[in-house]
């Protein structure tokens, strides 16, 4: 098996790996995108106020309840340290299970930017064990499709806080794994009724961006890329429930415009040259298009 990324880098490492695995098993994942559209208010809160990077952004999709609803049962086992987890891990691998494991990037040589430099939690997919060479086969599109010496996996596992020292396996129940478009649509409508956005991300950026230092510009870039990826993922769900050509078209335009503005910001970070008036015009355009999209979506499905 060779997992490939599916989600345009919207979900965190663990969720994107789960999605890639389910897709590789022909499990329909798009129905689980019903709540993937993120408000700019939440993106602003996490990225600007909490100073998270886009890779640490937290969103509610792919909850255990949603997985169970689709016949996917998450099975977790916690351990005090890797020495007590290793027998369970080897047993799961011997039974051809794919295992999700958390690790500290500080201890992972293939994570070149973080190794021996940054302590950060990362998800690895472990699919095999070579007992002779004491190495685990890791599938991680962020740096490795190959064997990782057990000593590195052990160090990465044990470096985490106790609550993160877990192994995760997904048990798939073919009998319960059915498509129920009406149930998916009902959940989406319930989510949509509760959805609110005051578009503070755009308003604050328009007000302050000319004075941003580099770290704030990086936050702006991350926020815009989250907006773009969220719209891209959510467009797949809208296409699934109703084909909705007008709404999907609006989403794709917003996705493209957010990515375009993010590219302008990244060029400025590198070259220190930007047409601020032109950038502001595009941000106002995106805000208007986002508001127009949500009004039309609520009018159609609310």
Curated annotation (Swiss-Prot):
Keyword Repeat among UniProt keywords: no
Gene3D superfamilies named among the record's database cross-references: Cysteine proteinases (3.90.70.10)
Pathway: Antibiotic biosynthesis; butirosin biosynthesis
Entry keywords, A to Z: Acyltransferase, Antibiotic biosynthesis, Transferase
Top EC class for this record: transferase
Documented EC number(s): 2.3.2.19
InterPro entries in alphabetical order: BtrH_N
GO molecular function: aminoacyltransferase activity
One Pfam assignment: BtrH_N
GO biological process: antibiotic biosynthetic process
Known catalytic reactions: 4-(gamma-L-glutamylamino)-(2S)-2-hydroxybutanoyl-[BtrI ACP] + ribostamycin = gamma-L-glutamyl-butirosin B + holo-[BtrI ACP] + H(+)
Function, as annotated: Aminoglycoside acyltransferase that attaches the (S)-4-amino-2-hydroxybutyrate (AHBA) side chain from the acyl carrier protein BtrI to the aminoglycoside ribostamycin in the biosynthetic pathway of butirosin. The AHBA side chain protects the antibiotic from several common resistance mechanisms.
Protein name: Ribostamycin:4-(gamma-L-glutamylamino)-(S)-2-hydroxybutanoyl-[BtrI acyl-carrier protein] 4-(gamma-L-glutamylamino)-(S)-2-hydroxybutanoate transferase
Native organism: Niallia circulans (Bacillus circulans)
Organismal lineage: Bacteria, Bacillati, Bacillota, Bacilli, Bacillales
């Amino acid at each position: 098996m060779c997992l490939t990324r599916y989600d345009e880098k919207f979900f965190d490492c663990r969720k994107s790996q789960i999605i890639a695995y389910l897709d590789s098993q022909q499990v329909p994942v798009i129905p689980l995108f019903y709540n993937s559209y993120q408000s700019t208010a939440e993106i602003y809160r996490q990225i600007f106020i909490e100073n998270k990077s886009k890779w640490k952004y937290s969103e509610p999709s792919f909850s255990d309840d949603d997985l169970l609803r689709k016949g996917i049962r998450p099975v977790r086992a916690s351990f005090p340290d890797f020495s007590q987890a290793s027998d369970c891990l080897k047993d799961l691998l011997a039974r051809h299970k794919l295992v999700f494991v958390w690790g500290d990037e500080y201890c992972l040589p293939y994570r070149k930017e973080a190794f021996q430099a940054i302590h950060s939690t990362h998800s690895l997919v472990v699919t095999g064990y070579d007992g002779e060479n004491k190495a685990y086969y890791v599938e991680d599109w962020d740096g490795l499709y190959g064997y990782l010496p057990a000593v590195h996996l052990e160090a990465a596992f044990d470096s985490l806080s106790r609550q993160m020292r877990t192994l995760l396996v997904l048990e798939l129940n073919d009998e319960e794994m059915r498509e129920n478009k009406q149930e998916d649509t009902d959940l989406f409508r319930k989510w949509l009724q509760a959805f609110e956005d005051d578009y503070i991300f755009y308003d604050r950026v328009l007000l302050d961006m000319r004075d941003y230092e580099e770290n704030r510009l990086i936050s702006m870039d991350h926020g815009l890329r989250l907006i773009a990826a969220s719209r891209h993922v959510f467009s797949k769900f809208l296409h699934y429930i109703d084909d909705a050509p007008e709404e999907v078209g609006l989403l794709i335009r917003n996705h493209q415009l957010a990515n375009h503005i993010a590219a302008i910001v990244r060029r400025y970070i590198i070259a220190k040259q930007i047409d601020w008036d032109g950038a502001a015009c595009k941000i106002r355009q995106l805000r208007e298009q986002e508001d127009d999209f949500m009004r039309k979506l609520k009018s159609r499905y609310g």
